[in-house]
């Protein structure tokens, strides 16, 4: 978090209140041990109506440990700033509460998300890989925060966000479309193509695939001030990042519809992307499905959980104060518009990043308890999970995005 209500420049202190090196290195081991101990207590005392709990095993502990390593890396990119910086953050959060409260957006969050204009001008460039070809598409985002919104000038100074980028795998004939929304620290072509198994979705299942890059990720993360990340401790940056991500994807949907008016469109999001996809699915009508993988339900609450601040740390007050803003940009405050048969969620029972009960279960309940798969793994374990792969394909079939088995596999032209 990095600006006062007056929107000063991004200012960071060299002093970090990070844990000592030794305790930081031992953290994943200690946290995994605590997780295993708690898992045994939950497993032995679980009730039928509670969150599914698997018998603790070495494999499950390994998944939890891997998550703890990932979490350690994410925290290294997001060190907690000192009290002086948090004082400025508190001022901006207070200004945000007043700004959003005066417009009643804290009570009616749908008004916060502005309706973007249709997307008409898109640049398309063909890219040839070793064996395949695909497209990169570019367009001007056109997003700006609301006039007078706290943090807006700082956000607009992140000029790399002004242009949206996306990967496109497209068939020559009309086909259903799947918009795949990546997670934190992604937004790079090789990684996104692999994690989403995009070529299988395109070549074998016959889908057109679009993979937009979220704000402050990939090419949109160039030239940022040190410490500027999305999501991160800067609450108003998180608000603007969420709003722009939703805006950009809604514009992209308008372009897809202008290309193939009759084709079905679905959303497929991972982690942070599942959070963004759930918001889009609560604002945009006409979507065939929304598949939410290990989704975040309340971004500000999640960041507060992982901030590492002690209970009596005065900076905790800022985190607590920001909770109404977190609820404003949460899908838990909106009504999903995707039909019930098109809602799907999958999550890991050993997830150490996105807490299954605090995040996923609440979103699942809010969405009317749609089809859900709990795989025995951590946050990153979905990639190796066969139940998840089968679930995603079944979701696409149930939503009508997949037709009869294809006799000819089209490759992008």
Curated annotation (Swiss-Prot):
Has strong T-cell and IFN-gamma inducing capacity in human tuberculin skin test positive patients, indicating this might be a good vaccine candidate. GO terms for cellular component: plasma membrane. Induction: A member of the dormancy regulon. Induced in response to reduced oxygen tension (hypoxia), low levels of nitric oxide (NO) and carbon monoxide (CO). It is hoped that this regulon will give insight into the latent, or dormant phase of infection. It comes from the Bacteria. This is Uncharacterized protein Rv2627c.
């Amino acid at each position: 978090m990095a600006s006062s209500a007056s929107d000063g420049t991004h200012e960071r202190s060299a002093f970090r209140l990070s844990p000592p090196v030794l305790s930081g290195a031992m953290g994943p081991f200690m946290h995994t041990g605590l997780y295993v101990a708690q898992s045994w207590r939950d497993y032995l005392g679980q009730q039928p109506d509670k969150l599914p709990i698997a018998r603790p095993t070495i494999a499950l502990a390994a998944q939890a440990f891997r998550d703890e390593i990932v979490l350690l890396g994410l925290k290294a990119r997001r060190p907690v700033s000192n009290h002086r910086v948090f004082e400025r953050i508190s001022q901006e959060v207070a200004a945000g509460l007043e700004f959003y409260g005066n417009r009643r957006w804290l009570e009616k969050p749908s008004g916060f998300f502005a309706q973007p204009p249709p997307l008409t001008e898109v640049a398309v460039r063909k890219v040839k890989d070793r064996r395949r070809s695909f497209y990169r598409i570019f367009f001007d985002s056109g997003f700006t925060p609301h006039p007078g919104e706290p943090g807006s000038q700082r956000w607009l100074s992140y000029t790399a966000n002004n242009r949206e980028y996306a990967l496109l795998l497209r068939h020559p004939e009309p086909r259903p479309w799947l918009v795949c929304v990546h997670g934190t620290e992604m937004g790079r072509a090789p990684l996104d193509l692999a994690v989403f198994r995009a070529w299988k979705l395109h070549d074998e299942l016959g889908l057109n695939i679009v993979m937009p890059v979220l704000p402050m990720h990939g090419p949109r993360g160039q030239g940022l001030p040190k410490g500027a990340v999305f999501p991160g401790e800067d609450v108003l940056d998180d608000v603007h990042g969420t709003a722009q991500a939703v805006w950009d994807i809604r514009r992209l949907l308008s372009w897809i519809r202008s290309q193939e008016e009759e084709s079905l469109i679905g959303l497929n999001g991972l982690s942070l992307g599942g959070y963004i996809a759930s918001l889009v699915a609560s604002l945009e009508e006409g979507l065939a499905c929304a598949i939410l993988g290990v989704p975040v339900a309340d971004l500000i609450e999640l960041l507060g959980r992982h901030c590492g601040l002690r209970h009596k740390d005065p900076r905790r007050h800022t985190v607590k104060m920001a909770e109404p803003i977190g609820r404003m940009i949460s899908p838990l405050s909106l009504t999903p518009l995707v039909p019930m048969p098109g809602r799907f969620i999958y999550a890991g029972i050993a997830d150490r990043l996105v807490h299954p009960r605090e995040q996923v279960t609440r979103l699942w309940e809010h969405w009317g308890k749609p089809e859900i798969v709990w795989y025995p793994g951590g946050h990153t374990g979905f990639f190796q999970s066969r139940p998840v792969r089968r679930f995603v394909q079944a979701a696409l079939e149930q939503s009508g995005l997949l037709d009869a088995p294809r006799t000819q596999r089209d490759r992008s032209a």
